[in-house]
Amino acid sequence: MNKEQKKNYISEMETQFQNNEAVMVTHYQGLTMSQLDELRAQMREHGIKFTITKNRITKIALEKTKCKELSNLFTGATAVAFSNDAIISARILSKFAKTNESLKLLGGIMGNEVLDQAAVQNVANLPTLDEARANLVGILATPASKLVSILLARSEKMSSLSPENS
């Protein structure tokens, strides 16, 4: 990689680290190309960019970003997932890591919060915004449906007691 390419790479990585709400760092040592392609395809379906990094140059790019605390994770065969939805990216990586032990989740950033490996797993178990909304609607609808059932049962009982039905 010549000097100009390195400058472009650093600039692109700085932009990715600054403009994405979620950054997940992984080690992929031992994954085959077909496994990497499969993971990339899953990520791409959700608008997540998954890229293999050049560690030394990436560390230079990290120095000027909110993600500089992740610098120590960039050793060995490292790849990064950039997205605006930490839950989806953590879920995909976590699920893939369960079936492909060569993929290791190292940590990441969600907003301005640094995540360690355990925190990434916790994020993967959180409901997405749509799932949380559906749960909330279900919780709010339950009392109303119970009230309707009680009122209907009461009206049926009242109508069966009326003299017209005798």
From Swiss-Prot:
<dbReference type="GO" id="GO:0006412">
    <property type="term" value="P:translation"/>
</dbReference>
<comment type="similarity">
    <text>Belongs to the universal ribosomal protein uL10 family.</text>
</comment>
<dbReference type="GO" id="GO:0005840">
    <property type="term" value="C:ribosome"/>
</dbReference>
<dbReference type="GO" id="GO:0070180">
    <property type="term" value="F:large ribosomal subunit rRNA binding"/>
</dbReference>
<comment type="subunit">
    <text>Part of the ribosomal stalk of the 50S ribosomal subunit. The N-terminus interacts with L11 and the large rRNA to form the base of the stalk. The C-terminus forms an elongated spine to which L12 dimers bind in a sequential fashion forming a multimeric L10(L12)X complex.</text>
</comment>
<dbReference type="InterPro" id="IPR001790">
    <property type="entry name" value="Ribosomal_uL10"/>
</dbReference>
<keyword id="KW-0689">Ribosomal protein</keyword>
<dbReference type="InterPro" id="IPR043141">
    <property type="entry name" value="Ribosomal_uL10-like_sf"/>
</dbReference>
<dbReference type="Pfam" id="PF00466">
    <property type="entry name" value="Ribosomal_L10"/>
</dbReference>
<keyword id="KW-0687">Ribonucleoprotein</keyword>
<keyword id="KW-0694">RNA-binding</keyword>
<dbReference type="InterPro" id="IPR022973">
    <property type="entry name" value="Ribosomal_uL10_bac"/>
</dbReference>
<keyword id="KW-0699">rRNA-binding</keyword>
<comment type="function">
    <text>Forms part of the ribosomal stalk, playing a central role in the interaction of the ribosome with GTP-bound translation factors.</text>
</comment>
<dbReference type="GO" id="GO:1990904">
    <property type="term" value="C:ribonucleoprotein complex"/>
</dbReference>
<dbReference type="InterPro" id="IPR047865">
    <property type="entry name" value="Ribosomal_uL10_bac_type"/>
</dbReference>
<protein>
    <recommendedName>
        <fullName>Large ribosomal subunit protein uL10</fullName>
    </recommendedName>
</protein>
